[in-house]
């Protein structure tokens, strides 16, 4: 099994180009079911993208992939969809697989989707997905680990209030509503940039969507959607990760190819710690300015601080001056990186959904193991900060969400290699 070997202690200097957003391209790929042909560009080279490709092909889609140096171009033809079951063997690899549920159900009136997998962080229940689809007239049962859904005729427009903000359920609801009969109004929706990007793609396909980027989205269902091409937005989570990498290594890095508006909350949090962050053309420049102060953090739905950056921020706070309190409000069981950081000398105590982080002068290299995607990269950041060797095991998690990570870091001076 592959592992990463990191010799830390080298400030990162240079520039990093940000790849397409995984959390945008996956629902956009699922949206291809709603039309006959979808041409997607700026697609990141990730195993999760390959898994979604396999899933769509399993349903009968014909997919052509054109590989470029920094991205993929994917052309999806869904005119021959002929299978409506998303099998466990594919779905278990990635929880985003559940996003084929809404499109299959709204276009074909039936779908059978295995309960999803992905990172082992919390229950991530599908109750809200099911509730909103039922409100559109779907008949749904869970049997033998599968969501069995059907509808008599077209789904119907509905008014639905999400009990809590859910990115996944918001996406499934939008994907179902664009072909439903009548008007759907969704309240307490997720506002994440990736949801906005999906909506822009659907609008380009001919969907009628109002309130994009707000907590209330109104959708007037269409009989069909058009073929189109679409460029996926850049990945704010990848950008934030490299911003923290620059800070933790006391470096100076330009993060390029990202809209500042979608990473401003990350930039402001870094500035609060004493790191210098300057908006530049097409990105930001992050520079260590001689100090790193402890600050508290709470994860919340966008525009709050992303849960997908919590682990990386914790690595940074492990070396800060003072004590910080990190509160995880999105997922339970998302502190699995803490024992591994403590193996590297971090002083962290977990109390329920809170972690108390007391900054130490230096972390030390160790053999550590990744438990999930974001935890794995937090350990890489920790390893880059040390003056010794770190070995990271179970790095297959990384390939789900970070394209060319070793190359991008190495180009900025990091000593990191995969063996």
Swiss-Prot record:
Chain residues that bind phosphoenolpyruvate: 22-23
Statement: the UniProt record of this protein carries the keyword Cell membrane: no
Domain of life per record: Bacteria
EC number: 2.5.1.7
GO cellular component: cytoplasm
Annotated UDP-N-acetyl-alpha-D-glucosamine binding sites: 95, 164-167, 308, 330
InterPro entries attached to this UniProt entry: Enolpyruvate_Tfrase_dom, Enolpyruvate_Tfrase_sf, MurA_subfamily, RNA3'P_cycl/enolpyr_Trfase_a/b, UDP_GlcNAc_COvinyl_MurA
Sorted UniProt keywords: Cell cycle, Cell division, Cell shape, Cell wall biogenesis/degradation, Cytoplasm, Peptidoglycan synthesis, Pyruvate, Transferase
Primary location: cytoplasm
Catalytic activity line of the entry: phosphoenolpyruvate + UDP-N-acetyl-alpha-D-glucosamine = UDP-N-acetyl-3-O-(1-carboxyvinyl)-alpha-D-glucosamine + phosphate
Biological processes annotated in GO: cell division; cell wall organization; peptidoglycan biosynthetic process; regulation of cell shape; UDP-N-acetylgalactosamine biosynthetic process
GO MF entry, a single one: UDP-N-acetylglucosamine 1-carboxyvinyltransferase activity
Signal peptide: none
Catalytic center residues: 119 (proton donor)
Pathway field: Cell wall biogenesis; peptidoglycan biosynthesis
Localization terms from the record: Cytoplasm
Keyword Membrane: no
Family, per entry: Belongs to the EPSP synthase family. MurA subfamily.
General function of this protein: Cell wall formation. Adds enolpyruvyl to UDP-N-acetylglucosamine.
UniProt protein name: UDP-N-acetylglucosamine 1-carboxyvinyltransferase
Taxonomic placement: Bacteria, Pseudomonadati, Pseudomonadota, Alphaproteobacteria, Rickettsiales
Gene that this polypeptide is encoded by: murA
